[in-house]
Amino acid sequence: MLEFFVAFVTLFVTVLYLLLMYEYGTDSIDEPKPPNVLPFVSIVIPVYNEQGVVGTTLDAVIAMDYPKNKLEVIVVDDESKDATAKEVEQYTHKHHFIKLIKNKHVGIGNSSAKNTGIKHAKGDLIATLDSDSYPSRDALKKMTAYFQDPSVMAATSEVRAYKPRNIIEQLQAVEYAVTIVSRKLLSFLDAVTVTPGPLSVYRAEVFKNLGDFDTGSILEDQEIAYRMQANNYKIESSISATVYTQVPSKIMTLLRQRIRWNRGGIRNYIKYRRMFSLKYGDFGIAILPLGFLGAMMVFVVLLSFFYTLITGQYFENYTYGLNSFFYGFGTVHVVSALIFLLTVAWIIIARKVIQNEKQDLSYVKIVAYLIAYPFLITIFWIATFLEEIIGKKQKW
């Protein structure tokens, strides 16, 4: 029964995305044009030991095609141990719209530095930008275009991997590209689940009405999105407002990142379990439950697998009927093959939507992603559940 449940959930999610793509088109997804009168925007950049990196971020911000009299950049230093503050000060002397603030609440995490910056922000819109992320020239203009609709309370960007080189970075480049389209499709259902740290823009009233980023969360950009969904705040998503972000280049660094994401996600599911309800529309009856089921499904499969290893039993369910493979295909084989083909179709369609000169997504990379990434995800979840079981403290 377990393999049929896994197959059903996977098939449902894949078909859902394909149907959304069919509904809203594959050639182009229209995005609003920037307003004639641009709003004043505050960009908050939290930094900690980012010497040699934050300068590149500030250069990208300065190069943006956005009136500097409509812009303020607030860099919040979380008591860096290196020369990050001195590097930022060089920019504050040259550019009047850039200022440096020292965070007094150090040691709490990235969300604390963001909150400090937000308290000093004067903009009608507040953007949060990671210190290792580089927005394109037109990114901010494209994102502010969404706020011409008074019901829109936040907008997310098109996050891409910055200059991927080795295989680990290339795999993430494909993953990020697929996520871009997935998040856009979820916005049509009013079901965006995260406002990514690399670049997201909020109305200032979001923080006035709902409070600051949760300093107790290790995945604060997802927590704030859930909080917005809980209050029926609309989140839009752009597939052309590009921001490039540094991605882990080593497997252990990637592992630590994904453990934090997974454990933070589990806590957010638990915190907002009340939202598993018709009251919250597609987000409450489909997207949130499916995310939770996916995590629990991985846990059950892994638990069953390790149980068979310990007991020495033959686990036919986990192997998807491998023994019967030699005697003929069973139902599970057919369903598994269908899921694989639909997944391939989904990724190819997603590639078509966002493929451009910004980044090459060759079919070779896609094939490598399809082969290697499921194994990596399994490893990430094994490590996640092990840390949860032993109660290891998770820091940002």
Where are each of the predicted segments found?
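Short, acidic, metal-binding catalytic loop of nucleotide-sugar glycosyltransferases
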Residues: D59-K70
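N-terminal membrane-anchoring/stem segments of glycan-assembly enzymes
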Residues: M1-V37, R351, I377-F380, T384-E388
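Membrane-embedded multi-pass helical conduit in multi-pass membrane proteins
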Residues: K33-P35, G294-I390
